[in-house]
Structures are given as C-alpha cells and as structure tokens.
Amino acid sequence: MSDEHEVIALLQQARTTRDADSVEAALTVAFQRGLTPSLVPLLCDLILDDWHTRHEDIALALEELRDPHSIDALARAALSSHAYLDYDENFGFARKCTWALARIATHEAFERLRELARCSNPTIAAYASKRLPNVA
C-alpha cells in the first residue's frame, strides 16, 4: 500500500470509528509522509466534525494544500465552536481558517473571506478583513 493510500485508510478508519486519538495519529503520519490533494475530501469532513480536537492541525494541512475544494469547509469551520477551544478568546482556529482561505487565493476564497469579514464576531471579522489586503 502506498503512503498516500495508507494515510487515507488511517483517516477513514479514524472517522468511521470516531476515534480522536486515531485522528491525531493519522494526521501525524500525513504530515510526516507528505500531504497530498487526495486527502482534501477527508480533511474537509474532519474539520467540520465535532468529536475530535485536531481542528487546528487540519486547518494547517488545508492551508498547505491550497485546494479550492476546501473553501466551503474552511469558511464554515471558521465560524464553528468547539468546547475544547472555549478558553481561546483570540479564536486562533478561525484565524488559521482565514489564513488557509487567503492562501488558496481564488475569487471564491476571497468572497468567503469577505463574508467572514461581515460576520457578527468582531475578532473573526477582523482576521478575515486583514487577509483581504494581503491577497487582493
């Protein structure tokens, strides 16, 4: 089995079993062996799942991959909330999502950043606004 297929299998198994530790392990393997575009659909699903604690790692992976297919998931994830991140008044996860959108740098990604810049959370809105001048 190729590295790519092994990573896909690990991520699928982690998601099927809803095993948070397995998500962490699979992401570690993915980063070690190299992220590939074939991971994007699974990463998009996982970034929206609420049963694990690796959302920031997934945002970083999607930022590195810069795949336009991840735009919707990243924009939705930027507005999501997770109990384990309640301590973070700076919304670091949302910030990572806005960086990923900016790095994708398509018209659709910029449009989603504009939408986020109008959201009701002033911190997230500021992150999105800040990304626009850097990429537009």
Regions found by a protein language model. Give the residues of each.
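Amphipathic alpha-helical segments within extended alpha-helical solenoids and repeat-rich scaffolds
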Residues: 70-81, 122-123
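Buried hydrophobic core positions in alpha-solenoid tandem helical repeats
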Residues: 6-11, 39-44, 73-78, 111-115
